[in-house]
A protein has these predicted regions:
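Bacterial N-terminal signal peptides that target proteins for export
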Residues: 1-8
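Acidic, contiguous N-terminal accessory segments
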Residues: 6, 19-92, 122-126
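Residues embedded in well-ordered secondary-structure elements
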Residues: 8-9, 129
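Low-complexity, intrinsically disordered regions enriched in charged/polar residues
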Residues: 9-10, 37, 99, 106
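Amphipathic, positively biased hydrophobic alpha-helical segments used for protein targeting
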Residues: 10-11, 119
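Hydrophobic h-region of N-terminal signal peptides that target proteins for export
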Residues: 11-18
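Feature activates predominantly on carbohydrate-active enzymes
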Residues: 23, 42, 46, 79-85, ...
Length: 240
């Protein structure tokens, strides 16, 4: 009986705590790009973790409730912003994140995310802020090569196979890595291999050029499709 009372007390406490959470609304336009939606998802995850009740609204971007903290994400044709640049403005309970492009919106969201994380969850948003990356390409290089030559292959010949590069086929790890690149405002991923075409391209006139079996080739196609799609919605170019 005592344990039952303790359980009910704990449940009621959690319920009341949830009811008392501040609500934050994130609004995106009906035609929001994948990058804008990705920025919204990243922001939502951070606010959820910080203890806020997050409402996602795509379509109507009218600021209709001044009592609710609202974040509006939009792409704008603002020539005063550089490529990948953003403008954050806050008036009352409305914070606007305007990006010159989808990447600009992502970086504007990252600015808000950093401020939430650096202030113990407080919504310390700037009244006015414009910023943009200084360098055109900012990225990381991942080597798909080894320190020694493979038996039966020449220099720089390292076919993409699960046996040689098992980590390359780990989608969950790639998601974490791509998110890390975004958090550091990187926009390019360089996959370094001296001769990648033998693992990725089939030519009718040169069937012998393919150095992996059909199953591995299809696996490589699927992985590159996955990797480029996930990278693109984060504003990242995959350069092979």
């Amino acid at each position: 009986m005592k344990n039952t009372r303790l359980f009910m007390f704990a449940a009621c406490t959690l319920f009341l705590a949830a009811c008392g959470r501040q609500t934050v609304k994130i609004m995106t336009p009906p035609d929001a790009s994948n990058r804008v939606l990705f920025g919204a998802e990243q922001l939502q995850a951070t606010l959820d973790k910080a203890g806020y009740q997050v409402m996602m609204q795509q379509g109507d971007t009218t600021f209709s409730d001044a009592e609710i903290k609202t974040i509006l994400l939009t792409e704008v044709n603002d020539t005063t912003l550089k490529k990948e640049g953003f403008h954050i403005s806050t008036t009352g309970n409305l914070t606007r994140v305007s990006g010159r492009d989808g990447s600009g919106v992502i970086y504007g969201c990252r600015e808000l995310i950093d401020r939430v994380n650096d202030s113990d969850g407080r919504l310390n948003f700037p009244e006015e802020l414009k910023d943009a990356p200084e360098m055109v390409l900012r990225g990381a290089c991942v080597g798909l090569q080894k320190m020694t030559s493979l038996p039966g292959h020449g220099v720089y010949e390292y076919p993409y196979t699960p046996e040689s590069f098992p980590w390359f086929y780990d989608k969950e790890q790639w998601i974490k890595y791509l998110d890390m690149l975004v958090a550091n405002r990187m926009n390019s991923l360089y996959l370094w291999n001296g001769h990648p075409f033998a693992s990725l391209v089939k030519l009718e006139d040169y069937p012998f050029a393919l150095e992996v079996d059909e199953e591995t080739f299809k696996m490589n196609e699927e992985m590159f499709s996955f990797l480029t799609e996930e990278a693109d919605k984060r504003g990242i170019f995959v350069i092979q």
